[in-house]
């Protein structure tokens, strides 16, 4: 009886810690990316981040007895990982021209695109889900119309394809034979990061100088906390709580990113942009509620 009681106490504590990691760590990575860009080329930084995180996590999991993925599972991980890591890399590219807060607000529309893409596999939105899609898209249009994105066409294009790539990878991950548990995240990060590193070399990216202390600390933070810790927390939540709770980070990350950008990054955020954030999150919330977890 005592063991059962302890398990019941430990599980909620673990869920709270995992949610904290997703809400605040992933929300803070937008500002971390901006700081890391002071010393790292965008694609090199993204690729190295995920190769380092995936390699260390994979080695730790294998040392603890996790099974070696089959070739078929590696292939699925390469496809999903490329889409997800490419989505993240495009955020890094976009943050060369837009603020971390604006990038986070734009990326908050990702679940909306995921619902649309899921319709291609036959799961079209219900009536209220269409309402959520319309509300969320109005938020994106408001953000664009105010000029936060319009002032940077390159940043707008990068963020648009970032949301599509991440959404496609998320939807596809449910239909492919990925490895079991956290090993899937490690394999995805390894494969996706390697693809981005190749793209960086082809693009001719080079270090103009040795990265400064702030850029190095930010990069280390992205590797350890943004990738290893947060991805592990996400995998834990997917195993223990409803998907609607596990993916609720999409509602909180933009708020954290906007706040940190204003407090620590000296970024400004207009009232109209806050309205856009509210519309996007309302739309995502309606869709999530209709999906019923």
Model-derived regions, located:
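Glycine-/small-residue-enriched transmembrane alpha-helix faces in small-molecule transporters
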Residues: 2-47, 82, 90-93, 147-175, ...
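C-terminal-most transmembrane helix of multi-pass membrane proteins
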Residues: 2-9, 50, 215-217, 251-293
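Juxtamembrane helix-entry segments on the extracytoplasmic side of multipass membrane proteins
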Residues: 11-16, 38-47, 69-75, 130, ...
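Specific transmembrane alpha-helical segments of multi-pass solute transporters/efflux pumps
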Residues: 25, 29-33, 58-107, 140-142, ...
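Helix-helix packing/entry segments at the starts of transmembrane helices
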Residues: 46-48, 103-109, 172-194, 223, ...
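Transmembrane alpha-helical segments that form core, pore/gating elements
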Residues: 54-57, 113-116, 120, 133, ...
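C-terminal transmembrane-helix exit sites in multi-pass transporters
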Residues: 56-68, 110-131, 255-274
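Hydrophobic transmembrane alpha-helices of multi-pass small-molecule transport proteins
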Residues: 57, 78, 84, 109, ...
